[in-house]
Amino acid sequence: VHGHLRESTCIRCYTIYPADATADAVLEREEVPLCPSCGGVLKPNIIMFGEMLPVRVLNNAKREVRNCDVIIAIGSSLEVAPVGDLPMLAKSLGAKFIIINLGQTYADSFADVVIHADVVDVLPKIAAAFA
């Protein structure tokens, strides 16, 4: 929901580029990466603090939640709406709800499974169990 770092998008012309095309500017030259097409700033395809979540992204997430059997909240306090409300929507529709988070959340008492631990430690163990 909050994006990924595999691509960057020009904030002026909305052209999408692979992240490796912008990595040199940021990592080696410590420059703001610019769009080769229009000169606009290239931004990673993530939602930055204070940015609005695109309606399309939220609607897609809600559609997926309505069809899921299990939802896992990983490393989230679940305090920021509207994304923080998605696990409760899934739970209300019959999905199993798992929380993996270092600290407690308001939803701990509603979850089917709660693991209070660092996700860096827990996720490799879960992945190994499915390997």
Where does each model-flagged region fall?
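Conserved catalytic alpha/beta core of Sir2/sirtuin-type deacylases, generalized to analogous enzyme cores
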Residues: 1-131
